[in-house]
Regions:
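PLP-dependent amino-acid enzyme catalytic core
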Residues: 1-316
Length: 316
């Protein structure tokens, strides 16, 4: 069972390699809301997102048998970058299947880090191909979010932000498959149970809200959002119960909300991020943050900054 001791072990394991990311004040949003808003800038982590944490924790705890045949993964991009980087540190081969609409910037970045990248269909088709490759090649699957070692690595974000924001009363965190918010939830439940943890999803990829409505993980037939890093069609068997127990509310934001948040972060907060990283700010700007406590600081997790010049032009 994933617990606070496991998160602390992961944090110590990662500490020699990965930096503590800064907590950046968002002055404009603070003035608008009349309370302090902080941005946990995982966009400044190695490989440009929090995903390096989980990937490296997985590699550092893997057995020889798990590594012997090489690794396989499915990713919209950030898990691909994080795993390719971590695997290169360990000298392990990795094959990644990405949907055909994946960011060209993330595809090329993963290949530059040494991964074999296969583009195939949508996210559901990409998963089907990876399962075949696991059988055919003897790969070990490294799930992007539904693995306790991955979740524990991501949970180091929660330990950091609790140290950095002692007056925080709420954390808003993006949800794709739920690995990051699950890890943060383990930390907050153990160390600051009064803190309210709120998940934010794009309307076109609200897989956790769908799971809550269905009473368990249930696959979305269609995923459509500019926030490709959050485009998981189904949440995990591990992440669903963790989120159901620890997340007090979910919010969904529209593509228009997302565009406004991107402009705010780029030009107001002076922070380059990718669309999936902007959903928490989008919820606050659109006043879609449910169940916010009346007092205390707000922390918004900014999950990544991996976007190419062509994608950046959409917001300039």
């Amino acid at each position: 069972m994933l617990d606070i001791a496991t998160l602390r072990e992961a944090r110590a394991r990662l500490g020699d390699t990965l930096p503590v990311t800064p907590l950046v004040p968002d002055h404009g949003l603070s003035e608008r809301l009349g309370r302090r808003v902080w941005l946990k800038a995982e966009s400044l982590q190695r490989t440009g997102s929090f995903k390096a944490r989980g990937a490296l924790n997985w590699l550092l705890t893997a057995s020889r048998d798990e590594l012997a045949g090489g690794l396989g993964a499915v990713s919209a991009g950030n898990h691909a970058l994080g795993l390719a980087w971590a695997a290169r540190q360990a000298g392990v081969a990795v094959t990644i299947v990405m949907p055909e609409n994946a960011s060209a910037f993330k595809v090329s970045g993963s290949r530059e880090l040494g991964a074999e990248v296969i583009l195939h269909g949508d996210i559901n088709a990409a998963w089907a191909l990876m399962h075949r490759l696991v059988d055919e090649r003897g790969l070990t699957l490294v799930h992007p979010y539904d693995d306790e070692r991955i979740i524990a690595g991501q949970g180091s974000v929660g330990l950091e932000l609790l140290d950095q924001a002692p007056e925080a009363s709420a954390v808003l965190c993006p949800i794709g498959g739920g690995g990051l918010i699950s890890g943060i939830g383990v930390a907050t439940a153990a160390l600051r149970p009064s803190l309210r943890l709120i998940g934010v999803e794009p309307l076109g990829a609200a897989s956790m809200a769908h799971a809550w409505a269905e009473g368990g993980p249930a696959r979305l037939d269609r995923v459509e959002t500019a926030a490709k890093s959050l485009a998981a069609a189904i949440v995990g068997e591990h992440t669903y119960p963790l989120c159901r127990a620890q997340v007090v509310a979910l919010a969904q934001v529209s593509e228009a909300d997302l565009e406004r948040a991107m402009h705010h972060l780029l030009y107001g907060a002076k922070l380059m991020v990718e669309p999936g990283a902007a959903v928490g700010v989008a919820a606050l700007l659109a006043r879609h943050g449910p169940d916010l406590p009346p007092d205390g600081d707000l922390v918004v997790v900014i999950t990544g900054a991996n976007l190419g010049p062509d994608e950046l032009r959409d917001y300039t």
